[in-house]
Amino acid sequence: MSQWYELQQLDSKFLEQVHQLYDDSFPMEIRQYLAQWLEKQDWEHAANDVSFATIRFHDLLSQLDDQYSRFSLENNFLLQHNIRKSKRNLQDNFQEDPIQMSMIIYSCLKEERKILENAQRFNQAQSGNIQSTVMLDKQKELDSKVRNVKDKVMCIEHEIKSLEDLQDEYDFKCKTLQNREHETNGVAKSDQKQEQLLLKKMYLMLDNKRKEVVHKIIELLNVTELTQNALINDELVEWKRRQQSACIGGPPNACLDQLQNWFTIVAESLQQVRQQLKKLEELEQKYTYEHDPITKNKQVLWDRTFSLFQQLIQSSFVVERQPCMPTHPQRPLVLKTGVQFTVKLRLLVKLQELNYNLKVKVLFDKDVNERNTVKGFRKFNILGTHTKVMNMEESTNGSLAAEFRHLQLKEQKNAGTRTNEGPLIVTEELHSLSFETQLCQPGLVIDLETTSLPVVVISNVSQLPSGWASILWYNMLVAEPRNLSFFLTPPCARWAQLSEVLSWQFSSVTKRGLNVDQLNMLGEKLLGPNASPDGLIPWTRFCKENINDKNFPFWLWIESILELIKKHLLPLWNDGCIMGFISKERERALLKDQQPGTFLLRFSESSREGAITFTWVERSQNGGEPDFHAVEPYTKKELSAVTFPDIIRNYKVMAAENIPENPLKYLYPNIDKDHAFGKYYSRPKEAPEPMELDGPKGTGYIKTELISVSEVHPSRLQTTDNLLPMSPEEFDEVSRIVGSVEFDSMMNTV
């Protein structure tokens, strides 16, 4: 998509800024007609080089002539007139000063980019504000619902107290009247009738009050159910989905404390309702009557309250931290046999009476059908302490939790020789950890169970990359925790999904994810030149099939580069010095108009173990197309001996017997090499202690340094005029430094 096309999609307030960039000296018509051609030229270079500016000026006039011809074929007289007028104006204004035209065009394109960036930031801010506002409004709404439940419980508490007072008064008056009727003198009939009418009235008030209390409890349970459904079916589900994303490198998951607060308030409210129902039963036992609303509704109210509390407490039992080996904290859900792993459980209902009352047991592959239905499906035993009591003391935030820190898996070995004829390879075989406990209170027994996300069990660390690929693919595409047959028929992933997850793999271990250009290159590798966000990528294409003409799959190549960055290139990657994922064609397109000695850093596409190289541009001696030179890629072996910044600093090329020189001058687009990498150069080491080598005049070891030297034919260099012939002594010294490796076969020398 051209920059000019993107600008035309902006809101009117940004389009107005674009209009202000252009006037008669360089009209907008030319920008419109020659949009793509203008954007492909290096106007910054032209603005600083009169000869280059002159060439671009005449090229632009030629482009206008071509456009005029197209309008002629279309018989568009008005546009022909405009083109001729624009061309004459350009010739009048810039024929003698082409640099001025280049400066204007460069400035306009630069300002356009700023307008696009400002518009993008504005849209992101608007989107972020809208999203934040929506989330905040949703949180406020839930807060209001939870408070409403709590307030209604308190209201019912007061209503039951009023009911109890009314019933006590009614009972007292009934007994008083009965006692007076049994007295010797009796009660006057008129007085007796009056008191009976009063009791009748009180009875009706009592009946209405009981009906009112029962109705309010029913209403409370209705509101509680709606609130609880929002917590369980919306908030908790969203948290679990965010946890899946966080497990595979996505944004960190939100804290559970707010969710715990809501769950706890609702649970406390339901516990209070249970106490209120007990109170109503006590009142019923003291006094009941035909069609008593308490007698009629109490069982339904008990059952419904228990059902809501059971659903809430069972849903609140979650895996707060998924199974993970401490040795690989950024690769959760991949477990190696014989290596300890940790997992943390949490109860979102934080009631003091539950502290130290819930004993959690961990089980492996409980009720997993695949154990019997999938041929070759492995079975494992759990070693270590597999029971733990939940408490509030071990957690830093005081939550009710249980953390298993010393669990291990051991494979059950079947008698006979194990075959690998099953439909799933080891790293596609999904397993699960289940956790059980039981809540016991007077008149209340509830079984709790939760399950981890699927895990991959490996027996060798070399299986870790493939195992992690399975975890990525599953959690990117599935929200179900128990779909362990997923890889029998794994679905395809859309490039829009996979590209985001690939970027997470870099941003989760570095300070920088993948930008659009880098992702476009990877998309073309997987989908070809017509890659689109909706392009479908099969699982086998991502992880199992050799990519293009290479002898390794796409994911293992990415994983190797990740390891190379983490161990050897992290500061350079974080600073944005490494372009990394760029095709050779795109690389040459970027470098061809740059000044000699401009270079960029990219990852090798042909190295299975991950490698990085640099390519620089030189002007050809015959004035034709520029020459490009790429050094043999550096792997972890070379980078373990010498840091990459030092390699760039000391790199030399040698032609025949001339003095070696460093061809690397500017990091693309125009950053001085020492400015880009200087802070990473190794500092000089202290001189070694003198040693007696040849008597009293011995001065110790002679310091050596590892450098990279490439021999090239003189014709491949920009020029050899400035490479002075070396004396025999100088040549011998260089040969000594380089070593005995033959120059014609040498690329990197130790």
From Swiss-Prot:
Changing Y701E: Not phosphorylated at S-708 upon IFNB induction. Changing S727E: No change in enhancement of MAPK-induced sumoylation. Residues 573-670 form the SH2 domain. The keyword Cytoplasm applies. Changing T749A: Reduced transcriptional activation of ARID5A and IL12B. No effect on nuclear translocation. Abolishes IKKB-mediated phosphorylation at this position. The modification Phosphothreonine is found at T749. There is a cross-link at K703 (Glycyl lysine isopeptide (Lys-Gly) (interchain with G-Cter in SUMO2)). SUPFAM superfamilies: p53-like transcription factors, SH2 domain, STAT, Transcription factor STAT-4 N-domain. Changing L724A: Impaired phosphorylation at S-727. Signal transducer and transcription activator that mediates cellular responses to interferons (IFNs), cytokine KITLG/SCF and other cytokines and other growth factors. Following type I IFN (IFN-alpha and IFN-beta) binding to cell surface receptors, signaling via protein kinases leads to activation of Jak kinases (TYK2 and JAK1) and to tyrosine phosphorylation of STAT1 and STAT2. The phosphorylated STATs dimerize and associate with ISGF3G/IRF-9 to form a complex termed ISGF3 transcription factor, that enters the nucleus. This is Signal transducer and activator of transcription 1-alpha/beta. It comes from Homo sapiens (Human). The lineage of its organism: Eukaryota, Metazoa, Chordata, Craniata, Vertebrata. The gene is STAT1.
